[in-house]
């Protein structure tokens, strides 16, 4: 089944899970699309089975809190940041609920975490105005970049370069093998800073970069030229909430939730809004991602919703 405007318009909530007592701050699908794992401000980690459509288990990180949870490439392991007493990144085995390793170094809260799509490397960005490069096999930081402001960062789909959005005004591209030489490209955005950048993602084909903000617009940028291709708006976000924007796996569509529980979908090429879907969420949709392998997506406030299309194209 191919994603089209009409298939996207047909998506409806198939299941809602109420496992959390506070907002879900992040979730991540496993690379095979079979599970999704969430982190919440209630200090819990919930693992869901996407095929059965049910929660499998719940773990807790009461002391440190849990945010920015990401699957690694090894089965049943995740990395996540703390949102309580320290700024160390933790590497957890879900199998026996034990920490494999800690990654200390940041002196302020970690606000971005991206796992390499190809190996055990990951990057983290912090309010201490640095991006750190790590390897899961070592607790020592493998590289450090000092920036002029708060960073958002992500690997490209090949795992060869990473992009850093700095100070909500420029995107810098680094070659992973020679990042210490500085960025090989810098794109300055000529825009009035009415809001902060809260996320940065590459499309799966590597051609586009999506910048999410805590305002009521997101930007789609050409990853090679740094040109803004589209600015998408017209969704509700009056309280400057961090709303996650995402690409569909075919790189063709862009989705974002809103504070009123609706999901807005645009065609990336034409820039036209193709759908507004009502998730009937009780709060702002802080997390939204399409499953990498199956025709389903998930959205979350303090509840988690799984969506399915209602037509067969």
From Swiss-Prot:
Domain of life where this protein originates: Eukaryota
Keyword Metal-binding: no
Residue spans of the WD repeats: 19-58, 105-144, 146-184, 192-231, 236-276, 280-313
Matching SMART domains: WD40
Changes seen on gene knockout: Embryonic lethality after embryo transplantation.
Gene Ontology MF term list: chromatin binding; lncRNA binding
Broad class of the protein's primary localization: nucleus
GO terms for cellular component: chromatin; chromosome, telomeric region; nucleolus; nucleus; PTW/PP1 phosphatase complex; Set1C/COMPASS complex
Known function: Regulatory component of the SET1/COMPASS complex implicated in the tethering of this complex to transcriptional start sites of active genes. Facilitates histone H3 'Lys-4' methylation (H3K4me) via recruitment of the SETD1A or SETD1B to the 'Ser-5' phosphorylated C-terminal domain (CTD) of RNA polymerase II large subunit (POLR2A). Component of the PNUTS-PP1 protein phosphatase complex, a protein phosphatase 1 (PP1) complex that promotes RNA polymerase II transcription pause-release, allowing transcription elongation.
Assigned protein family: Belongs to the WD repeat SWD2 family.
Protein name as it appears in the record: WD repeat-containing protein 82
Species the sequence originates in: Mus musculus
Primary gene name: Wdr82
């Amino acid at each position: 089944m191919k994603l089209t405007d009409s298939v996207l318009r047909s998506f409806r909530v198939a299941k809602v899970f109420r496992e959390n007592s506070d907002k879900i701050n992040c979730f991540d699908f496993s690379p095979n699309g079979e599970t999704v794992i969430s982190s919440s401000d209630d200090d819990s980690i919930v693992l869901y089975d996407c095929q059965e459509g049910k929660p499998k288990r719940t773990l807790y990180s009461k002391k440190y809190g849990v945010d920015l949870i990401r699957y690694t490439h090894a089965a049943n392991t995740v990395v996540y940041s703390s949102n309580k007493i320290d700024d160390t990144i933790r590497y957890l085995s879900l199998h026996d609920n034990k920490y494999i390793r800690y990654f200390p170094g940041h002196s302020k809260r970690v606000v971005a975490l991206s796992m390499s799509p190809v190996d055990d490397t990951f990057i983290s960005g912090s309010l201490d105005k640095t991006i750190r490069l790590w390897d899961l096999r070592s607790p020592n930081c493998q590289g450090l970049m000092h920036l002029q402001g708060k960073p958002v960062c992500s690997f490209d789909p090949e795992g060869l370069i990473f992009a850093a959005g700095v100070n909500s005004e420029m995107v810098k591209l680094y070659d992973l093998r020679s990042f210490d030489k500085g960025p090989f490209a810098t794109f300055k955005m000529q825009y009035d800073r009415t809001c902060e950048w809260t996320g940065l993602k590459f499309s799966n084909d590597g051609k586009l970069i999506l910048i999410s903000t805590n305002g009521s617009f997101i930007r789609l940028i050409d990853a090679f030229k740094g040109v803004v291709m589209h600015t998408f708006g017209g969704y509700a976000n009056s309280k400057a909430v961090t709303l996650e924007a995402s690409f569909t796996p075919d790189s063709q569509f862009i989705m974002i939730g809103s504070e009123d529980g609706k999901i807005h979908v645009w065609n990336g090429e034409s820039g036209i809004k193709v759908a507004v879907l009502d998730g009937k969420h009780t709060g702002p949709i802080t997390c939204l991602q399409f499953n990498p392998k199956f025709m389903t997506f998930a959205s979350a406030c303090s509840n988690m919703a799984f969506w399915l299309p209602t037509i067969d194209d």
